[in-house]
């Protein structure tokens, strides 16, 4: 007996040496195996010692989140929704906590080793129609559950990248609820999502849960054709123009089976005629005998190819809602730190922020704000081997109706960004005793004109990998200075709003008088836990601000002493 205990003790010691971290409850252990990375989040493989299952450990840096407006709100929205929503086709959140010492937010979620449905479909091109119908039924079950909440929950960013697969069982679950919203009014108003999957009414800022049905239709189109919707468009503005003009993606014409095409087109109908998730789940197409569909994927599985640029595979609950933006590991690209530039021109503020994604791509976000209260945010990719700053800027102006002076400003900012990016890369390589960039490399960067190998390659590179374009009013009473004022405070207050939003899900379901005692106790416990988490975060934020002020004062004093 004693020898057995000693043996188990040796195993325990070996296991403890293998893991990197343990959660406060002592139930979950994190390994150093990285499953995926986002702009401010890293997903690690972890293990649940109680149930004996592998899980995903989502680690978010608070300092990084604070630097990205709106992301804290999205993160807390996702945490609250996942805690409140329980369904077999919605990804599970097991546990979450704030680590004050390391200044991180941690979430333990289900692990899907097969990755997203998009990656899974790309890997397995020859898929029987039965499988696609099975995926569709599961997605619709998840959507019906979200939309049946009181008030309804709208995902707003449904796409194959945000649907995850268990390849061993064929199980499919909806994830990435960071952009989801609780519909407390008849229609929602904010414009947000991924352009290729956004319903026309989303741009009009008057929509309801049926926008998710439109996105589901685009998911079906991608599953059937193995092509990203609107891949014929070269930038987000062209997608916007087609969607708002009710022009369907060219890939829809590649769907040969009339019943499949009819089913997809039902999802893309105007909102007033669009069926609900429950109605679609009862559609005869999903009940058809799979044996009759042998030719459904014949053309797409053999000839179609994904035309999107290579991307990092986003694992479950990647809160970096770009969705399509690839963010590489700093270990692979040590020069990939974020660069931000600012210009004031024609009484407008231009902000360009981005980072290098890989050897040939940089991901950028351009924000243009004017005193009238209108703000435009455009996400795009710059392909270093073929794109030019002027060409990218002119494309934006052509579709977004900007002035010629704004073309110059945007092109100049992109030029400066690329120069700084290449300069940072040179420094990084030098520090690691790697070869420096040659003189010719710098000349190419200065000119920002690199001829593509052929016309087809140029066309391919110009298909910018764009995640979203937002148009929304902001408070601009004091001009440019007001644009940034109170942004952090708004993020924190929006967290409190999200708390109250989730409370209404329960409050509108049953009245206070109908609460059983055990439910009251559980709800009070949840309320106190999240209030404490908020206080912890607020304290961390205040500490970070004080540290920044102290560093600035110290730096200023040193400069005075030297002079």
Swiss-Prot record:
Task: List the catalytic activities from the record.
Answer: L-seryl-[protein] + ATP = O-phospho-L-seryl-[protein] + ADP + H(+); L-threonyl-[protein] + ATP = O-phospho-L-threonyl-[protein] + ADP + H(+)
Q: Where is the composition biased (Polar residues)?
A: 426-436
Reply yes or no: does the keyword Transferase apply: yes
Residue numbers bearing the Phosphoserine modification: 509
Q: Where in the cell is it found?
A: Nucleus
What are the catalytic residues?
176 (proton acceptor)
Q: What class of enzyme is it?
A: transferase
Q: What happens when the gene is disrupted?
A: Plants display early flowering and altered expression of genes involved in the photoperiod flowering pathway, such as ELF4, TOC1, CO and FT.
Q: Name one GO cellular component term.
A: nucleus
Any idea what job this protein has?
A: Regulates flowering time by modulating the photoperiod pathway. Phosphorylates the vacuolar ATPase subunit C (VATC) and RGS1. Regulates EDM2 that, in turn, modulates development processes.
Q: Which family does it belong to?
A: Belongs to the protein kinase superfamily. Ser/Thr protein kinase family. WNK subfamily.
> What is this protein called in UniProt?
Serine/threonine-protein kinase WNK8
Q: Which organism is it from?
A: Arabidopsis thaliana
